[in-house]
């Protein structure tokens, strides 16, 4: 796979980033946190869209964005692929293009296709193509055992260990099932015993059931006989009751028919009587109707002319009123000689005189107010002079009171501060108590933490010893191997030395063979001894590692407790400081002990002087507002205007003028009223003359109407009797649906019909009474038969219940037998199941032992991969142009370079070996690898090692494309392409150089 381009929108810190890649080395350079590693994370997401915390949408999407997208273009086997992944909060939009054509759209389909194209999954991609920070240096520095574990993870062997662990869980669940089955199978003897017991009980119940069935059949026969007798009696009882009911109905109907006959007779009498009344009152009835018509005609005429008549009467009333009022006015005006205009001029002159008097009256009031003000000024002057000393004392007391108030505020602030300090002290004391209880384990943990450096030194010493012993053991094993080879060669030789080809005797050959055997034995003994020492040291190291791990596990808690310890010291210091402040405040507060008494004293003094101060202040304000000289000048001016007038004189003159004014107004009104009334009287008299003819006719019609009404009253009684009788006859006519003239005939006919029907009913009654005697029903015999039947029925029901109970018990027992038979069958099935599980458990043990155990398939994979890793490692190592030819990865995962332990090489050479090994592992995992991504490969390396690594990178030819993520600027020197990443605000910006 060769990466061509990556595009990111709203992905982590990349708002809108596009990077083109080419073959060779691409250095992605930027400071920590600039967004370099996000570029690889985007590639990983584009290819496989993995799940997990690191790939959660909220963690990948920029804050405030509604979506993010990643596009990756790459080449593989001559084809161009473009993967597009877009994510919203609740929606996905993925596409895969092959050579520009849409190939897949769903996320799962794209993931599957990518795995098919690359021939690797996400796990292999993450381990083979992406080399994480520190992996290169760590491969050399770690022990063979740790190296074995790391390489196992990179190769994916650890999944077989996990599978082995999961198989233990499965195996355990089967073991639990076996225990459960064994427990259930213990019930079998008890179930068989219960089954036999139930079968015996069923046989006994069947015999009892047969006996009861015989009794049941005899009683049922007797019950049917007695039931037949009762049914016959019930029929007689029903027939007798029906006849009695019929007789009762006939008697009732005869009674009703007689009532109807009587009602028809009564109606016939009433019709005759009402017909007579109609004949007697018919003449006056007709006369009444004629009078009523005439009255109605006159009434219509009166209504038509009523308005004219009422208008005439109203005009006559007004005429009388006007004549009367004109007479009164003429009497009142007999002494007046002036016309209205002259009188109005006199009224105007009178009003002007009244106005002058009102103005003088206002001036008198103004003068009285000024004299009052002058008097009050004198009073207030005297008040100010009298209270001057009291006011001065009051002002001094106010100043003193303000000073005391300021002191009181200070005092209250001190009290508040004291309260706050006491509260703070209480809280700190509680906090201290809490911290003391939480810090009980602190000293023990601290003591263990303090031993860490010492343990680490010992651990490192042991590691060095182990490495040295391993080196010695390797050398000795190499020597043993050489001796064995020499011995084997010597054994093959007949008469010449295998080394120098010189002649050798059999004795010399035996001597040399013994020497080789002796050397081999000595070296083997020495090696065994060293291995025992090594095992002891490894055990010590492992125990020490356990202790160090324990210390590591304590570190987090220790950190928390350390913080709490420091915090507790601060709390203690704060308690001391707060206590000192509290003591100091208490001293200051005591200085204010007499303050309240002083304030009370001054408050009483101010209270006593307050009225004097207010009075004096009011008088001073009054004198400021009112100038005495101005009031005196005004008094003089007003006195000149008023002259010898006083209020009494003005009132008398004004009263005379008002009386004259009223007289003039009254005379003017009467003169004008007389003229208007005369005009109105003339108009009314003309209207009266026009209406006099109509009024005479109206009076005549009223007289005629009154005469007719009197005559109508005389005929009214006969009219009402006629109408009442007619209403009765109409009611009968409506009731019987017959004309009034045919009522007599109809009622006589009805009476005859009803009498005839009544005679027939009497005959039926006689017949029913005879039938009742014929039935001959006896209630006593019927009751005795019912009691006997009831006793038989009760006995029958008792037997039936017993029979049902036995049947129910039999059914239940048979069901229990079926249930127990099923249970026995189930237990038989469980025996089979137990056998199968035991066989399958043995099969699982075999699979685990032969495939998933460390000595099974895992061992096979390691043995398969070690030569493959070694071959790829050496191919890459050859490109580095170093003075070494061969790297050996031994079975125990120790590294040998040209026969020397890797630890004996220089730092730069070790890095070269480590890089070759890491790339070799990648190629072993993914044979067709063309691209490698290295994340901070120079991390944790000193300057010399970094320089060596740069030179090595230049020499790599096996891998077509390398992307190096780094913050070291030196990597620009070896790069074919440079991508610089920097953080501006919250966004990453990329530039190509």
From Swiss-Prot:
Q: Where does Zn(2+) bind?
A: 497, 500
Query: What is any one GO biological process for this UniProt entry?
Result: double-strand break repair
| Co-factor remark | Binds 1 zinc ion per homodimer.
Give yes or no: UniProt keyword Transmembrane helix.
Answer: no
Give the top-rank taxon of the lineage listed in the UniProt record for this protein.
Archaea
Where is ATP bound in this sequence?
12, 32-38, 133
Keywords, comma-separated and alphabetical: ATP-binding, Coiled coil, DNA damage, DNA repair, Hydrolase, Metal-binding, Nucleotide-binding, Zinc
What residue stretches are annotated with the Zinc-hook domain? 452-556
Residues of the signal sequence?
Answer: none
Q: Which GO terms describe its molecular function?
A: ATP binding; ATP hydrolysis activity; zinc ion binding
Q: What is recorded about the domains?
A: The two conserved Cys that bind zinc constitute the zinc-hook, which separates the large intramolecular coiled coil regions. The 2 Cys residues coordinate one molecule of zinc with the help of the 2 Cys residues of the zinc-hook of another Rad50 molecule, thereby forming a V-shaped homodimer.
| Protein's recorded name | DNA double-strand break repair Rad50 ATPase
From which organism does this entry originate?
A: Methanococcus maripaludis (strain DSM 14266 / JCM 13030 / NBRC 101832 / S2 / LL)
């Amino acid at each position: 796979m060769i990466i061509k381009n990556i595009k990111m929108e709203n992905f982590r810190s990349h708002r809108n980033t596009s990077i083109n890649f080419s073959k060779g080395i691409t250095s992605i350079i930027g400071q920590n946190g600039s967004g370099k590693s996000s570029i690889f994370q985007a590639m990983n997401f584009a290819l496989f869209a993995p799940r997990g915390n690191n790939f959660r949408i909220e963690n990948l999407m920029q804050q405030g964005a509604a979506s993010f997208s990643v596009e990756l273009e790459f080449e593989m086997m001559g084809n161009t692929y473009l993967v597009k992944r877009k994510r919203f909060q609740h929606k996905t939009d993925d596409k895969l293009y092959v050579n520009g054509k849409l190939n897949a759209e769903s996320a799962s389909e794209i993931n599957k296709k990518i795995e098919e194209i690359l021939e690797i999954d996400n796990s292999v991609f993450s381990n083979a193509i992406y080399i994480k920070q520190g992996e290169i240096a760590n491969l050399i520095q770690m022990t063979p055992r740790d190296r074995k574990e790391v390489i196992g993870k990179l190769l994916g062997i650890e999944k077989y260990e996990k599978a082995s662990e999961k198989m233990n869980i499965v195996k355990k669940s089967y073991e639990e099932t076996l225990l459960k089955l064994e427990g259930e199978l213990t019930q079998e003897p008890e179930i068989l015993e219960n089954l036999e017991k139930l079968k015996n009980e069923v046989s006994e119940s069947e015999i009892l059931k047969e006996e009861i069935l015989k009794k049941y059949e005899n009683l049922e026969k007797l019950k049917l006989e007695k039931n037949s007798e009762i049914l016959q009696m019930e029929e007689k009882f029903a027939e007798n009751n029906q006849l009695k009911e019929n007789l009762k109905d006939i008697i009732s109907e005869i009674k009703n028919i007689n009532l109807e006959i009587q009602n028809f007779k009564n109606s016939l009498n009433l019709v005759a009587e009402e017909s007579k009344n109609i004949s007697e009152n018919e003449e006056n009835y007709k006369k009444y109707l004629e009078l009523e018509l005439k009255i109605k005609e006159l009434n219509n005429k009166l209504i038509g002319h009523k308005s004219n008549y009422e208008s005439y009467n109203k005009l006559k009333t007004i005429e009388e009123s006007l004549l009367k009022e004109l007479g009164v006015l003429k009497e009142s005006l007999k002494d007046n000689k002036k016309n209205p205009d002259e009188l109005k001029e006199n009224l105007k002159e009178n009003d002007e005189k009244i106005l002058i008097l009102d103005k003088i009256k206002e001036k008198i009031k103004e003068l009285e107010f000024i004299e009052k003000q002058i008097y009050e000024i004198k009073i207030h002057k005297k008040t100010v002079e009298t209270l001057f000393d009291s006011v001065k004392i009051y002002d001094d007391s106010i100043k003193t009171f303000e000073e005391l108030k300021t002191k009181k505020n200070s005092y209250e602030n001190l009290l508040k501060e004291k309260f706050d300090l006491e509260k703070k002290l209480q809280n700190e004391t509680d906090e201290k108590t809490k911290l003391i209880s939480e810090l009980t384990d602190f000293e023990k943990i601290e003591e263990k933490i303090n031993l860490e450096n010492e343990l680490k030194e010992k651990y490192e010493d042991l590691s060095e010893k182990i490495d040295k012993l391993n080196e010695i053991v390797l050398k000795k094993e190499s020597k043993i191997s050489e001796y064995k080879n020499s011995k084997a060669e010597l054994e093959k030789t007949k008469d010449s030395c295998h080394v120098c080809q010189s002649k050798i005797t059999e004795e010399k050959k035996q001597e040399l063979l013994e020497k080789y055997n002796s050397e081999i034995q000595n070296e083997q003994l020495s090696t065994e001894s060293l291995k025992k020492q090594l095992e002891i040291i490894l055990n010590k190291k492992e125990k020490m590692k356990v202790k160090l791990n324990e210390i590591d596990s304590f570190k987090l808690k220790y950190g928390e407790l350390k913080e709490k310890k420091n915090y507790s010291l601060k709390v203690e210091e704060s308690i001391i400081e707060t206590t000192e402040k509290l003591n100091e405040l208490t001293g200051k507060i005591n200085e204010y002990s007499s303050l309240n008494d002083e304030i009370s004293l001054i408050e009483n003094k101010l209270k006593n002087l307050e009225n004097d101060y207010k009075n004096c202040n009011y008088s001073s304000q009054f004198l400021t507002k009112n100038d005495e000289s101005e009031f005196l000048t005004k008094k003089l001016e007003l006195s000149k205007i008023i002259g010898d007038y006083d209020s009494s004189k003005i009132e008398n003159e004004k009263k005379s003028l008002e009386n004259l004014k009223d007289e003039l107004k009254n005379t003017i009104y009467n003169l004008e009223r007389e003229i208007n009334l005369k005009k109105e009287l003339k108009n009314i008299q003309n209207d009266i003359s026009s209406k006099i003819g109509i009024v005479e006719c109206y009076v005549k019609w009223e007289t005629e109407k009154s005469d007719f009404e009197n005559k109508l009253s005389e005929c009214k009684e006969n009219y009402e009797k006629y109408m009442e009788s007619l209403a009765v006859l109409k009611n009968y006519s409506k009731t019987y649906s017959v004309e009034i003239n045919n009522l007599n005939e109809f009622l006589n006919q009805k009476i005859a019909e009803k009498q005839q029907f009544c005679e027939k009913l009497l005959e039926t009654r006689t017949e029913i009474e005879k039938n009742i005697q014929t039935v001959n029903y006896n209630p006593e015999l019927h009751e005795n038969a019912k009691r006997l039947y009831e006793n038989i029925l009760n006995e029958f029901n008792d037997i039936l219940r017993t029979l049902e109970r036995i049947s129910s018990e039999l059914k239940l027992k048979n069901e229990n037998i079926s249930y127990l038979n099923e249970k026995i069958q189930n237990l038989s099935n469980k025996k089979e199941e137990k056998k199968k599980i035991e066989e399958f458990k043995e099969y699982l043990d075999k699979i685990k032992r032969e495939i998933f155990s460390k000595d099974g398939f895992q061992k096979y994979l390691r043995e398969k991969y070690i030569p493959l890793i070694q071959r790829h490692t050496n191919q890459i190592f050859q490109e580095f142009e170093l003075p070494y030819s061969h790297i050996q990865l031994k079975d125990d995962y120790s590294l040998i370079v040209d026969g020397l332990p890797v630890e004996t090489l220089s730092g730069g050479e070790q890095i070269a070996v480590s890089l070759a090994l890491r790339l070799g592992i990648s190629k072993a995992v993914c044979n067709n690898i063309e691209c490698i991504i290295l994340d901070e490969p120079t991390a944790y390396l000193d300057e010399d090692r970094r320089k060596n690594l740069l030179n090595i990178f230049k020499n790599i030819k096996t891998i077509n494309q390398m992307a190096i993520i780094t913050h070291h600027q030196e990597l620009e020197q070896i790069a074919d392409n440079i991508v610089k990443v920097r953080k501006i605000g919250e966004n990453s910006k990329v530039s190509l150089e």
